[in-house]
Amino acid sequence: MEFFNILQSACNDVNLDFNDKKYNQLISYKNLIQEWNKKINLTAIVEDDEIIKKHFIDCIKIFKSSPIGEAKSLIDIGTGAGFPGIPIKILKEDIEITLLDSLQKRINFLNIVIGELQLKNIQCLHGRAEDYAQEIQHRQKYDIAVSRAVANLAVLSEFCIPFVEKGGYFIAMKGPSVEEEITAATKSIEILGGKIEDIIKIDIEDTDLKHNLVIIKKVKETGKRYPRKPGIIKKNPLK
C-alpha cells in the first residue's frame, strides 16, 4: 500500500486519475525492469523504492505540462527502458504512443512489456531518430515528441522537433542546470521551427532529484534538410 499511496499522491498533484489497474501495471513494469536488467543494461536504478520515485514519479511529473493532457499522439525519442513513454501510456490510456530506440535488445524488452501489460495503441521502432524523422509516416505527424535521453538540448532538438506537427510540442526532460543549454540551443530551436514556451521546475519528493521540463512549441514547419545525416548532429550541433 505504501507504493500505491506514493503514486496516487503524485497523480493527484497533476490531476490524474489513479486506480488499481494502473498501479498493478506499473508494478508489473517495475518487476520486468528488474528481471530484464540482469540480462541487458536498462537502468542503474534497480531498487523498488528508487524505481518508483526516480523513474515512475519523475515520469508522472511530465503531466505538469498542459500539452500532454491534451495530446492524442506522442513519440518518445531514445526511450531506453520505456521512460517516459510507457508510464504515460499507463496513466493516459487514450493516447497513441510510439517508442523509438536504437538498440534492438531494448526494443525486445519493450515489446515484452507491452504484451505483458496488455497495452493498446503503442508501437516500438528500432533505429535512428535522424532516419525515421525523414519518413513521411513519422515526419511532422505527432502532437508531442518527448525525450529523457542524455544529450544537450541543441542535439535533442534536431532529433525531436522534426517529428512534431506545427502547433505541437517537444518536451525535453532535463537536469537541474539547464540555463546554459537553453542559451546555447535557442538559435537551433528557432532554425528547426520551434520556440521555447515554458520551463517547469520539477522536484521529486524524498529524493535529491531536481529536474526541468523544457516546453518547446512548434511554430513553423521544419526545413527539409533537417534532421541532418546520422553522425553529423552530435559532431556539429546547430548554432
Swiss-Prot record:
InterPro entries registered for this protein in UniProt: rRNA_ssu_MeTfrase_G, SAM-dependent_MTases_sf
Subcellular location: Cytoplasm
Originating gene: rsmG
Species classification: Bacteria, Bacillati, Bacillota, Clostridia, Eubacteriales
Residues in the signal sequence: none
Name this polypeptide is given: Ribosomal RNA small subunit methyltransferase G
Domain of life from the UniProt record: Bacteria
GO molecular function, one term: rRNA (guanine-N7-)-methyltransferase activity
Gene3D superfamilies (UniProt xref): Vaccinia Virus protein VP39
Annotated source species: Clostridium botulinum (strain Langeland / NCTC 10281 / Type F)
Xref: CDD domains: AdoMet_MTases
